[in-house]
């Protein structure tokens, strides 16, 4: 088992310098700066990987980019409409570029409409720590009152 930690990239208030102190070896991250549907270039991947690897966990071991979270799936692919074939090719090229950089553990999020939904980004647990939380009732309210969806239901 490898201990990893989610890092939201260079703009994350949690810095790699601090994260490396919590007993992890791997970083779970993405290239959130790349537009959905656009290819992740080998150069961009290499640059992010080098940034992560520039931090040592100890004298002989560096942090590593262990997991991609997430390589976004464009909505045209999800709906099989529009330029979905183009976006599939871009996605495949991104996978190849990740593999060329020896990053092979790739998560994706196939949520329709909104790619990444959490209803509370600072939910306090009983021990005082914070976690991300999903509340389906809040999502239904969002669908009904913000998106004005006719299909929102409590499942």
Regions found by a protein language model. Give the residues of each.
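Alpha-helix-loop-beta-strand connector modules within alpha/beta enzyme cores
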Residues: 46-68, 91, 129-134
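Glycine-rich, proline-tolerant flexible connector loops at the mouths of alpha/beta enzymes
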Residues: 30-47
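Active-site acidic/histidine proton-transfer and metal-coordination neighborhood
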Residues: 77-155
